[in-house]
Amino acid sequence: MTAAIRTKLSAMMFLEFFIWGSWFVTLGTYLLKDLKTSGIEVGAAVTTQSIGAIVAPFIIGLIADKFFSAQKILGALHLLGGALLWWASTAANFSAFYPVILVYMILYMPTLALVNSVSFRQMQNPSKEFPPIRVLGTIGWIVAGVLISYLNWDKQGGEAALVNTFKMASIASIILGLFSFTLPATPPVKRGENVSVGDMLGLDAIGLLKNKSYLIFFIASIAICVPLAFYYGFANPFFQEAGMHATTVTQSLGQVSEILFMVMIPFFFVRLGVKKMLAVGMLAWALRYVLFAYGDAGSNYWMLIAGIVLHGVCYDFFFVTGQIYTDNLAGERFKSAAQGFITLATYGVGMLIGSLIAGQIVDNYKISDTAHNWQTIWLIPAGIAAVVLVLFLLLFKDKNHMETNPALNLDEQQDMRLDV
């Protein structure tokens, strides 16, 4: 891969996640403060990510893999997405906002796979060449948060400026849309082949569920996405109400933590194994929400920061470890199908259920238009994570020890990730 191609791919990855990070982190605050929505409506808006994740395999399987070059589809989707994001910024109420953002996420979620496809097709050694390019995506997400706080769009009492996050994302999406047509040619790989629904959804890997331990892990993965949905939808509104300054850039510490813990996964994997790694990840979810429940912007401010920084443990130790576990258990034939299957289950089904539950609970503990009983709200997902952890420890038997060095497989997982 030449330096010019590496630069283009890095810019593509930066913009891909800059766009998402520009509006998604502050979505809950924008909806609650600007559009005066309910918690249920915020949850519904967050479920658009899940719906997009469910639809994405069909767009990739029916269009990208069979008929058109990946970089051209990427460009078209981002140009359309840019127009939709600007349209979303003009919505005066939730009924006008929701259908626009739903269509946008159905178009955006497939681009996460497309940027990986464009990248991998240019590489001779993906395990070494991809991670430095993928990390630019996380940096793009962080930079978006820094800009939002630097421009004071998320300052206390100034939430009306958050509409600008959609405009910033719109402009970046149009730039990436145009830029995509300059990317290296990535022709369809399955032109003329028949692709079944099972192929697109990864259902060929459903046989893994015959393994009792994997079935327990699979159910736990869906269940742990319920607490995850609370963070995605309501962390930013909580920090705002708690009195935290520069909430968006502060939340980006979670992505910094994620990068650091990603590097340390091989070290811990060798010493802890699959079961303990997954358990630590679930324990971290419970702990972070307890910290949020008892933290504040005063003497317990450290609890809020600690809860944010735990994101690296929460995500990497459970979800990335789970991807490695799935990859090794599936075998060479079903690797891709297995990853698609677990992604559909977690970010599709699990997050969808979790977002709806989170929205209902936030509404149930609303005190006024500007205040909620956050302590109770956060203790609920903490309890859910704790119950999932206990059941997992009792039922999961780590009979399938990793036979390969997890450090060799770690880089391969990064293309499957939807989170940053």
Q: What would you call each of these model-derived segments?
A:
Residues 88-90, 173-184, 379-411, 418-420:
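Multi-pass alpha-helical transporter architecture, strongest
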Residues 1-3, 183-219, 412-416:
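Juxtamembrane intracellular "pre-TM" segments in multi-pass secondary transporters
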Residues 2-50, 213-251, 319:
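Helix-loop boundary and gating motifs at the non-cytosolic
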Residues 55-92:
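Conserved MFS/SLC helix-loop-helix module at the cytosolic interface between two early adjacent transmembrane helices
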Residues 150-171, 360-385:
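A membrane-interface helix-boundary motif in multi-pass transporters
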Residues 55-69, 152-153, 260-274, 362-363:
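Helix-to-loop junctions at the C-terminal end of transmembrane segments
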Residues 14, 84, 94-114, 118, ...:
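Hydrophobic core of transmembrane alpha-helices in multi-pass small-molecule transporters
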Residues 72-86, 276-291:
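Structural signature of the two symmetry-related core transmembrane helices
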